[in-house]
Amino acid sequence: MNLFFDTSALVKYFHIEEGTDKVTALIRNSDHEIWVLELARIEFMSALFRRYREHIINDEQLGLAISGFETEYSTFNVEPLNQIVASEAEALLKKYGKSEGLRTLDALHLGAFRLLAEEDWIFVSADEVLGNVVQIEGFRVINPCNKK
C-alpha cells in the first residue's frame, strides 16, 4: 500500500506527540511504501525549529530529530516539487481555497498526491482542513490523531 505523508503527520515520527504511535506503525510496516513531497524536508526542519524556539524540545532533542530525519528521509519515495505540482496546487486553491480554507503548502502536498495516487493510495495528515479536502477529492485519509 502506498502512503503519502504531509509534514503534519511526518513530524510525529521524529517527535513524540499525539499520533506518534500510529505514524510509527504506518511507516515501519514493510507492506507500506512511504511517499512525501520534496517540500516536506523544508517544512519538517521549520517545524522542528519552531518547537525548539517554543521550548517544546531542547537542543539535544533537536539534534536527534534532525539526524534521525535525514537518515530516514533517504528511505522515502520523494516526489519532486516542480511546475506540474505547482499548477495542480493552484487549481486546488482555486477550487477549495475560498470554500474549504485550503492553504498554499497543503495545496502543494495534495497536488503532488493527486498526480501520483492510484486506487490503493492513502493520504496521511494530521491537518483536519487538508484531510477534509482530500476526502472531498475522493481519496482515503488517515489522521494519526484520530482514535479510530
Which ranges hold each PLM region?
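Acidic, PIN/NYN-like endoribonuclease modules and their adjacent C-terminal/linker elements
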Residues: 2, 115-148
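Alpha-helix capping/helix-boundary segments
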Residues: 10, 40, 85, 109, ...
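Alpha-helical elements of the RecA-like P-loop NTPase motor core of helicases
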Residues: 21, 46, 87, 131-132
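Active-site-proximal, substrate-binding regions of enzyme catalytic domains
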Residues: 39, 46-98
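Active-site neighborhoods of divalent-metal-dependent phosphate/nucleic-acid chemistry enzymes
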Residues: 76-126
